[in-house]
């Protein structure tokens, strides 16, 4: 096993890797930019190395600086995390050529997956299911009609040199094909100057289901079951879970075998994820292999009990999967769900936020609640990097229990400072499609307007009542303390806001829906008046 590694990343994933290393007795070296000089991943490492200015292009994407830091620190290996250089074959190759271990797949495997079109050709040749289609140069209309019938309907006609949604038509029957082909070719010719088209089976309302795989130096490849990531917004994952509520034992066996076959076909080593698109009838097709650890890996850890980062480290150090994970298929327990807490504004097209985290209250962790974060209260969310605050992962004996645990955990989460998506996530997990698991990759985009409906404001009388309750509790606690003092009648032992020469005044603050609400309680004769300090319209009330 390694004695020291460098983590070529920042934020949440760097902190996550450090936790496994700390438990295994491995020293860690952090790299940091100007903006991250006091970041959590730097404070949590055994040592740190500055690698450049704040923009990623001047720091976390500077492979030569990161490699120099690794060599200078005496690290034996480099863990790339996810994002940045994690899937850069040249970086992986440079690390190995420098005499260090790259904690991930080989550069050769990465290059084979670098082209999505090339990857599909390779997978098809290996026997992994890919979406049927036609990509040939021959554009004779009669040939295209025959190919369409071979591919099957519904299918999609796509401009070969297009993009941006132009030159695309969904065709649901043979009778529609000729007219749709002509229309698509005209649009492609006008938009791109070329009218060549491709044909591809159209999978309606698909699910995104992926399999976690691992390979080792002996050539062994295994899978650790599936995760479902169908709740997406513009192809960005929002909620991930394991096991998939859609996958039964038969489908799991078939997809798992295909995932292992995909890994073996490119001599895969270390952690990877084989992504599939799955139709409503259970037909599944290869999409791509992510050649790194995934953001959503904790849901697999929660249901298998395995530490995937530890597995990465041990496999990179030469240990074999047969010894590390002897039981196949890997047994799972219960249900896990992950959501990502972001500094972003869902009501403003999910615009990323930045600024100081004035207040950050996260749920208490337990066997059923896990938090993977890279910031704490008082830290800055900068404009330079992904605005993730934390990943919230929950576990329950079944999906219903896990959703209930997630609802409780989100209710206990408070973010004051930059806008966050906490309230959006609370509404999302209560949506009928999520509760019933009747989702597909387009669900969230279709239903976004409904989920973004802002709930009615809390009535002013309720806010005033909350303030009254807090004041009464404060007075009751003060009375208990006063009785314990030598002089129970001392004005210093009373919580009535008494001030010499001025009316009594007490301030109370509450966090609600990412707002800091402040109330002032003014002492009157035999009563107290409560005023909302920062409201546009004051909330007023009195109590005797």
Pin down the residues of each PLM region.
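Catalytic cores of soluble metabolic enzymes centered on carboxylation/carboxyl-transfer
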Residues: 259, 298-543
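N-terminal beta-alpha lobe that positions the nucleotide/phosphoryl donor
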Residues: 1-274, 278-297
